[in-house]
Amino acid sequence: MSEDLGSVCSVKGDRITFFLNKRVNLTFGQIVRVDSKNNQSFYARVVNAESRSTLETGEQLREAEGKETFGPYSSYKNIDAVLFLEMNHGRVRSPTFNPNYMDKVVSLNKEDSRLLRLEGQLVMGVVRSGGQTLDNVGISIDALPRMIGMFGMTGSGKTNTELMLNAQLIDNSPRTAGLIFDFAGQLLDGKEIGGKGLSNHPLFHNKVGFYSAKEERLRIGLRTLVPLKLSTLFPGIGYPQYRLANELYKKLGSRWIEEAREVYVVKGQKGIAELAGYSNRTVIEALMSRLLGLGTVLFPASDYSFVDNVVQNISKGITCLIDISGITSEEQHHIVCLTATGVANHYKRMWEKRYEQWQKLPTLLITLEEAHEFLDPNRPKTIFSAIALTYRKYRVGLNAVTPRPSRINPDVFAELWTKMIMKTELKADRDYLTKNAPYLEYSDTEIKMLDIGEALLISEPKIRFAVPVRITHYLEYLDKKEKVDYNLPSSKTLEALDENLERLQSISKDSNARA
């Protein structure tokens, strides 16, 4: 049931102002419906509110001091809202005109949610309407390759939003899969965000692959690094260094990095010059400095690469969570870029050479925390710029997560068709969002005042306006999920295990006595 909020008092272009009824709750960003004539309605978002008085200044002062009381019409509140949709005889589209003076303004109901088609397969939360919540709101699977951005200051609820989105990818496997780079090590166990993470998802054991530097599962053998991969490993590397690497590779084969490092340690720059037939000292020292910086833990002398296992898992619809906390920022950069390149290029090759098999691959979303470090226009370009700009047709999507949207390359930002905007306090970032994101021209105040767990959701072309959303708390989501029965045999009791241990120890003692 819709609540009567007030009536229109003025209209200009796409902005309306309406009187707010007494004792009505309203919030910045709330969506309201304006019922007009001829079975026509308009939808608008609240962007500003003002309290005013009809009294003269002297009368206001006397009223403030309690010396005089005036009637109920001595003060009023008017609300500014921006039109974004029109409904005419059941058909919803962008506004072709605007409402009339004194048209009624009402709150949304569940029927409005249905007409606005806000629920996608990947449910993120519920629509906020004043102090109430309405139907579910979500992102469609088709929106994943159109790229996503999650923006908000630290503590605004980004990690919870990441968990919710990736949990939905797991739920929709094998149709969808995720590649998640966790910089802070929070997503597995939910550290500092409630104590539950993706490891608590009912499908974790058969739908998620976990890789961590702490468990030494992030290994990329030096013999898998051909010269072509150097631009991925070291963005901004010059052509002369690549040419030198290619000469070393031709002479030494797959062990070129190991043997070149040995020669350089023993003979220095002259040894490399003789080996490659290349005498530029500056180029040799620059390349060898980079190669010597590859640590033996992450880059052992072998032909094994965990990236191959990641590609295999994702191809089967298994989401891969890569914990890169606890290693240096440079090592994080290496792991992230090499892994994302390997997976994205697999999708590209399949599309080009095995189209029928490509059609069976899950739609992929790569979640990249600290995205501004990889998408800054003032830094060398990485694979993530290419993914955002050109990999849509391969069904590879990027989820750029960052507290600093203003540091993202504008060309990349324009390709993020789905945006989840949480509380943002830095004015530079709010200005960037309101100037570069559609439907947010008047939303600076609203973005600043969002509460923890609240967001504005835009997901073109399905959701062509900013929807006020309360993101579902991940712990609540887990509570509602059914446990999965893996049909495993029941565990033995501790007493039975102790008896077996005593029996084995007794047998061992008898054996030693005979010996």
Question: How would you describe each model-predicted region?
Answer:
Residues 169-171, 342-348, 352, 384-399:
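Substrate-engagement module of ASCE P-loop NTPases
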